[in-house]
Swiss-Prot record:
It comes from Gallus gallus (Chicken). A connexon is composed of a hexamer of connexins. GO terms for biological process: cardiac muscle tissue development; cell development; cell-cell signaling; chemical synaptic transmission; gap junction assembly; vasculogenesis; visual perception. Keywords: Cell junction, Cell membrane, Gap junction, Membrane, Transmembrane, Transmembrane helix. Residues 356-366 have a biased composition (Polar residues). One gap junction consists of a cluster of closely packed pairs of transmembrane channels, the connexons, through which materials of low MW diffuse from one cell to a neighboring cell. Belongs to the connexin family. Gamma-type subfamily. This is Gap junction gamma-1 protein. It is a multi-pass membrane protein. PROSITE patterns: CONNEXINS_1 (PS00407), CONNEXINS_2 (PS00408). It comes from the Eukaryota. Pfam families: Connexin. InterPro entries: Connexin, Connexin45, Connexin_CCC, Connexin_CS, Connexin_N, Connexin_N_sf. The lineage of its organism: Eukaryota, Metazoa, Chordata, Craniata, Vertebrata. One of its GO terms (molecular function) is monoatomic ion channel activity.
Length: 394
């Protein structure tokens, strides 16, 4: 296993823990991994070769060394580091798997919402029902999303989620597994402290008295650098105790922090209960930004002229709406061509309606002129027949 893999692994553990867990990780790296790899190699490299006994009995030194150190100090500490770090590694794997699933579900929900908002709306038939030409007049214009912007959004990788504290761990549903790995880690620390005391005690003696077979009698064996090894042994005791205290501190931090958050939430709920809350929320469906919809008024007398005028006004409103919301988009020329074509059709309809309206009004005016001429002739005739008589005006 290379150091780069171990470094990446510890970095991921650092990103998925509380600040107390980050302190524990720093102690693990500096005072355990580095100290064991550097100091242990230089101190214990000649441990067995420098173990000398005052006898020449074959096999006696090996038996006495086995009695002095059933397990080498360095191997014991390496085994301790592996077992203590195992719960954190297992928690890391679980956290990465769960966060990846959460990110995947959030991406699916986001895509579903974007598809629901980008659906193509059908043309409004409010004015079509009153017309007799059986032609559809579009009353809604969707805000078209650029393909380049959509591709850029799809190409952007999702942001990497990191846990920076206790609240984030609780929000993602990792609190139970995090507390469980703390308990297992603390149990391992206590077990290794007891085992280290039973195997080595608190001091490395310079002389070890051995009476095992095949030694003929009690012999004295001498250990190299006993004082240096004693100091190193005490340092490792201190590091183990420090890691155990950090585990206890982190569990207390999680417990008291959770209690404090619960009390704060209850206090906020009590404060919010005093304010008036509406019994329902207004969840009426609405069109996305950029859409314009015309509502058919009730009991409105539709004529050909009114239809043409309303279509002309609606097209002008659509132009203003598209200029307001779509000024920064690249697909404006295509939309303007469609709008200009529709405006041209609406203007032609308006001219035809005005012409038809004028033609309908001209026969009425001519009949009125004829009637007025007939009335004038009758009045002139009556005036001629009644010459010499006084007319009385009332």
């Amino acid at each position: 296993m290379s150091w780069s893999f171990l470094t990446r692994l510890l970095e991921e553990i650092h990103n998925h823990s509380t600040f107390v867990g980050k302190i524990w990780l720093s102690v693990l790296i500096v005072f355990r991994i580095v100290l064991t790899a550097v100091g242990g190699e230089s101190i214990y490299y000649d441990e067995q070769s420098k173990f000398v006994c005052n006898t020449e009995q074959p096999g006696c030194e090996n038996v006495c060394y086995d009695a002095f150190a059933p397990l080498s100090h360095v191997r014991f500490w390496v085994f301790q580091i592996i077992l203590v770090a195992t719960p954190s590694v297992m928690y890391l794997g679980y956290a990465i798997h769960k966060i990846a699933r959460m990110v995947e579900h959030s991406d699916v929900d986001r895509r579903f919402r974007s598809k629901s908002f980008s659906t193509r709306w059908k043309q409004h038939r409010g004015l079509e029902e009153a017309e007799d030409d059986h032609e559809e007049d579009p009353m809604m214009y969707p805000e078209i999303e650029l393909e380049s912007e959509r591709e850029n959004k799809e190409q952007q990788p999702p942001a990497k989620a990191k846990h920076d504290g206790r609240r984030r761990i609780r929000e993602d549903g990792l609190m139970r597994i995090y507390v469980l790995q703390l308990l297992v880690r603390a149990t391992f620390e206590v077990g290794f402290l007891i085992g280290q005391y039973l195997l080595y005690g608190f001091e490395v003696s310079p002389v070890f008295v051995c009476s095992r077979k095949p030694c003929p009698h009690k012999i004295d064996c001498f250990i190299s650098r006993p004082t240096e090894k004693t100091i190193f042994l005490l340092i490792m005791y201190g590091v183990s105790c420090m890691c155990l205290l950090l585990n206890v501190w982190e569990m207390l931090h999680l417990g008291f922090g959770t209690i404090r958050d619960t009390l704060n939430n209850k206090r906020k709920e009590l404060e919010d209960s005093g304010t008036y809350n509406y019994p329902f929320t207004w969840n009426t469906p609405s069109a996305p930004p950029g859409y314009n919809i015309a509502v058919k008024p009730d009991q409105m007398q539709y004529t050909e002229l009114s239809n043409a005028k309303m279509a002309y006004k609606q097209n002008k409103a659509n132009i203003a709406q598209e200029q307001q919301y779509g000024s920064n988009e690249e697909n404006i020329p295509a939309d303007l061509e469609n709008l200009q074509r529709e405006i041209k059709v609406a203007q032609e309809r308006l001219d035809m309606a005005i012409q038809a309206y004028n033609n309908q009004n001209n026969p009425g005016s001519s009949s009125r002129e004829k009637k007025s001429k007939a009335g004038s002739n009758k009045s002139s005739a009556s005036s001629k027949s009644g010459d010499g008589k006084n007319s009385v005006w009332i």
